[in-house]
């Protein structure tokens, strides 16, 4: 019996097949083709979203963190889940930070860890900026609201460099080793200047040198020294494992994005629960933007003289705001903690813009 192809080219049927069978075949082919088209469309959408996230990783992390907090805090049936999971996510942050620093330090060049002149110049600038804020607080601190805003700016100037600064610096093309050394030096300076200046800002702030020394020592040891030593030992005894870690592109950076999402959620929570309002709240959110731009600009300006504008800009501009918030809540006016929380947003928007510009044009504009 002669066969002929079906009009859709997917099946063959005999002349004696009923039109009903043919119709079923036709519908089946349409279903298969539509499923294939749906899968291709779905994959295309996923790739477009992923490429968008890669291009704007830091701003996307900020938005995801903020929106995620708002959903789980204000959608009634999701509130219990948010209250249960939130603390666990926050407790996970130090673990992720440790892991991302280990991954980053696997790529470190020991010869780059030699202290540089700009490391100490930036510490003097950082201390001078903090002292300038202390003078302004002495001058205009009689007004409660003015003092609150100045305290917010003060903590943004004085808090040390972020431990994860090397991750963003690596993507921008700076030196991981040099930033690691700078971060250690910055924490040592912190041990001296915070106990010295905090009592001038808040007379009730009794910060002993011993207490601050132990806090800084614990911070430097657990966050920086241990992952650095593990990375160096891994390079010596587990070179194949290190090669596999290094082969995963931007692994440490995406770990940082995960932490940033959680940090942004916590920042939004602090801002929404702040008992200040109106122009005072607006200023506590806006002043850190100018502090952020000033520090990035000064750092880059100093770094240009040492062929290290990227590293120096990140060193002075990217702050450990978690420590800043803790210091404010513990020793200063707790309401001023809104400022270092806002600084998280501004510094990551600056970094996000720098990363976008470098990927688009192959160089940094600033």
Where are these regions (language model features)?
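Compositionally biased, low-complexity segments
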Residues: 1-2, 30
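Cationic, low-complexity basic patches in intrinsically disordered or flexible, solvent-exposed regions
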Residues: 5, 26, 34
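Alpha-helical transmembrane segments of multi-pass small-molecule/ion transporters
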Residues: 39-40, 44-366
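N-terminal amphipathic/hydrophobic targeting modules at extreme N-termini
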Residues: 4-6, 15-17
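Short hydrophobic transmembrane-like helices used for membrane targeting/insertion
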Residues: 1, 8, 45-46
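Intrinsic-disorder-associated, low-complexity terminal segments enriched in Asp/Asn/His/Tyr and depleted
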Residues: 16-19, 31, 39, 43
């Amino acid at each position: 019996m002669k066969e002929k192809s079906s009009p859709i080219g997917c099946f063959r049927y005999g002349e004696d097949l009923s039109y009903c069978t043919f119709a079923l075949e036709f519908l089946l082919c349409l279903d298969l083709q539509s499923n294939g088209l749906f899968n291709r469309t779905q994959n295309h959408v996923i790739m477009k979203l992923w490429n968008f996230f890669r291009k704007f990783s830091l701003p996307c992390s900020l938005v995801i963190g903020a929106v995620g907090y708002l959903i789980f805090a204000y959608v009634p049936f999701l509130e219990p889940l948010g209250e249960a999971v939130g603390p666990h996510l926050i407790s996970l942050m130090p673990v992720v930070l440790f892991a991302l620093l280990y991954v980053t330090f696997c790529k470190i060049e020991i010869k780059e860890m030699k202290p540089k002149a700009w490391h100490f110049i930036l510490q003097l600038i950082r201390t001078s900026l903090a002292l300038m804020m202390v003078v302004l607080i002495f001058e205009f601190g009689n007004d409660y609201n003015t003092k609150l805003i100045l305290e917010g700016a003060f903590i943004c100037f004085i808090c040390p460099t972020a431990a994860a600064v090397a991750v963003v610096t690596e993507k921008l093309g700076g030196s991981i080793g040099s930033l690691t050394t700078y971060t250690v030096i910055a924490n040592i300076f912190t041990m001296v200047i915070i106990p010295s200046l905090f009592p001038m800002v808040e007379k009730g702030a009794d910060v002993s040198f011993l207490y601050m020394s132990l806090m800084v020592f614990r911070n430097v040891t657990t966050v920086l020294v241990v992952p650095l030593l593990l990375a160096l030992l891994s390079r010596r005894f587990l070179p194949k494992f290190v090669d596999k870690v290094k082969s995963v592109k931007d692994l440490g950076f995406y770990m940082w994005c995960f932490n940033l999402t959680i940090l942004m959620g916590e920042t939004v929570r602090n801002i929404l629960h702040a008992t200040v309002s109106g122009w005072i709240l607006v200023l506590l959110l806006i002043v850190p933007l100018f502090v952020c731009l000033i520090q990035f600009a000064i750092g880059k300006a100093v770094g240009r003289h040492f062929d290290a504008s990227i590293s120096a800009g990140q060193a002075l501009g990217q702050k450990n705001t978690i420590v800043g918030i803790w210091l404010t809540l513990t020793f200063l006016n707790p309401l001023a903690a809104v400022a270092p929380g806002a600084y998280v947003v501004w510094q990551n928007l600056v970094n996000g813009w720098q990363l976008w510009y470098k990927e688009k044009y192959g160089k940094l504009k600033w």
